[in-house]
Amino acid sequence: MANTPEDTQNTQNDSQNDSQNDSQKDTSARATSARAHQQPQEQPPSPMRVLRGACAQLAELTGMEAESVSSFERTEDGWTLNVEVLELARVPDTMSLLASYEVELDAHGELSGYRRVRRYERGRSDRS
């Protein structure tokens, strides 16, 4: 059976339509794939979660439980806290030794460093 010019034109149109459909499917598949590879943005930890985590991490490293947090602030790199720790229990309690630790955390709340900045008896106030 011989192809007529009309048959040839229909074949070319079908071929072009198939090519366009394949191109659209490919573009759609790439867009779907790109969305699948995007990671959902993590929410930063809440200040309370950071505070509790910092106290727990400091206790794990020093073996001493935090008594209180005297300062807590967000920095460019994460967080900075001052944590009061009971270092030596004495009787009476006013003679117990406390220490103030400066604790640095990254933006995710992971401890990146700490140092003792002050040691004092519980019953003594700061001198001005």
Swiss-Prot record:
Subcellular localization: Gas vesicle
This protein's UniProt keywords: Gas vesicle
Spans annotated as Disordered: 1-49
Induction remarks: Gas vesicle production is induced by growth conditions that promote production of secondary metabolites tiancimycin A and B.
Biased composition (Polar residues): 29-41
Disulfide bonds: none
Biased amino acid composition, Low complexity: 7-22
An individual GO BP term: gas vesicle organization
InterPro entries: Gas-vesicle_GvpO (IPR008634)
GO cellular component: a single term: gas vesicle
Something else known: This strain probably produces some gas vesicles from the probable gvpO-gvpA-gvpF-gvpG-gvpJ-gvpL-gvpS-gvpK operon; it can be induced to produce more under certain growth conditions.
Role description: A minor component of the gas vesicle. May play a role in transcription and/or RNA stability and in GV assembly. Gas vesicles are hollow, gas filled proteinaceous nanostructures found in some microorganisms. It is not clear what function gas vesicles perform in soil bacteria.
Family: Belongs to the gas vesicle GvpO family.
Protein name as it appears in the record: Gas vesicle protein O
Gene source species: Streptomyces sp. (strain CB03234)
Native organism taxonomy: Bacteria, Bacillati, Actinomycetota, Actinomycetes, Kitasatosporales
Designated gene of the protein: gvpO
